[in-house]
Amino acid sequence: MRQCLFALLAALILVPSLASSQALEITVERDLIYGRVEGSALLADIGYPDGQNGLPAIIYVHGGRWRAGSRTGRNALDVEQWAGFGYFAMTIDYRLVGGSPAPAPYLDLLCAIRWVHAHADEYGIDSDNVYLIGNSAGGHLVALAATLGEGSFERVGGWSDARSDIRGVVSAAGPYELNTLSWGDLWTPVGGDVHAARRLASPIHQITENTKPILIIHSDDDQSVPIQQAVQMADALKAKNVRHEFVHYVDRGHMAITDEVITETRDFIKAIGGT
């Protein structure tokens, strides 16, 4: 009798395990072209669970002071991991300011958002649950998307008829005021008032009642982006009654997408209505 009971318990344990592994059948696509600008392809990697609908989407934007880095760097979001969480996950490359002046990186992010909306039916994406995550310069870009949105920028790269809205963003170690940032001078458009252009591209100056929820993650000893940038951004969001969270780490340096950041991100998305 005891042997039969043990066998039954083992079967009950095994069945959920098998069902779980079957539910995690994932497709990963590399080097997908999400847009074209002046004949050059904008590339992304994507991952998603097969045969699912209503997937929240998350787009990762890499750091590198807008002049370096890539979607495949050591700090990049793992699209296969996030697909396993039940997301459509995307990591993007964007034009770097060494070859294309600002605001090229931001325009490419907006193109990626439109691509996701344009392909929502194809990949089973819930268009009302599109999220962004970035670290360092990528954190700046996603925060700008949450505050400024498309602004008056021209749509480039493609999908000009698609939606470009997002549900919320996560910025790890991102800068929010470019005119006071030590490397803010890298954000230099061609012609015009450079100071005004950097102010336009500073999320802290673009906060309105329409700003999307933002999770700010920063360490007190960040030498690349001083934590004062994050503190001031959180204060500005609070002053405008914008939903946000500020997670302040100690002695973590210039933060990347660590396991802790992933946990904070998933909790934040759940809190604002995602999965």
Regions picked out by a protein language model, each given a short descriptive name:
Residues 54-64:
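Short beta-strand element of the alpha/beta-hydrolase
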Residues 72-91:
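Short amphipathic alpha-helix adjacent to the substrate-entry channel of hydrolases
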Residues 22-52:
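N-terminal cap/lid segment of alpha/beta-hydrolase-fold proteins
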Residues 111-183:
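Primarily recognizes the serine-hydrolase "nucleophile elbow" in alpha/beta-hydrolase
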Residues 177-178, 221-225, 255:
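Acidic catalytic loop of the alpha/beta-hydrolase fold
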Residues 210, 215-218, 222:
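Short beta-strand/loop motif that positions the catalytic acidic residue
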Residues 45, 227-275:
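C-terminal catalytic histidine-bearing segment of alpha/beta-hydrolase fold enzymes
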Residues 37, 174-206, 212:
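Mobile cap/lid helix-loop segments that gate and shape the active-site cleft of serine hydrolases
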